[in-house]
Amino acid sequence: MDKSKRLFLKSKRSFRRRLPPIQSGDRIDYRNISLISRFISQQGKILSRRVNRLTLKQQRLITIAIKQARILSLLPFRPKAQRFKKAQRFKRRQSTARTVGLRTRNK
């Protein structure tokens, strides 16, 4: 390649390939809560395959495992923070006096 064309070539940037989220030794099972909880959002939703960087088969197995764990109440359907906020909303408050000071009637 001559010198005039070399000016337009971009240098390739190096990048570090991310490690796969599931190693070969990990078992995708409803009892493996530490593994399953990595694929659930803070709202308690199952994260998409694109976000998780999983294969189709792995995503299917993770989804089934999460659903089984929820049914067997190993995982909550909703995270605890939301339940706490809801309970706080309906909490009864103390009644306050409507009058500011003592008022007397003028006769």
From Swiss-Prot:
A single BP term in Gene Ontology: translation
The keyword Transmembrane appears for this protein: no
Superkingdom as given in the UniProt entry: Eukaryota
Region (Disordered): 85-107
A cellular component annotation (GO) from this entry: mitochondrial small ribosomal subunit
Compartment(s): Plastid, Chloroplast
Record field: compositional bias (Basic residues): 85-95
Main location: plastid
GO molecular function annotations of the record: small ribosomal subunit rRNA binding; structural constituent of ribosome
Cell inner membrane as UniProt keyword: no
Family: Belongs to the bacterial ribosomal protein bS18 family.
Assembly and interaction partners: Part of the 30S ribosomal subunit.
Protein name in UniProt: Small ribosomal subunit protein bS18c
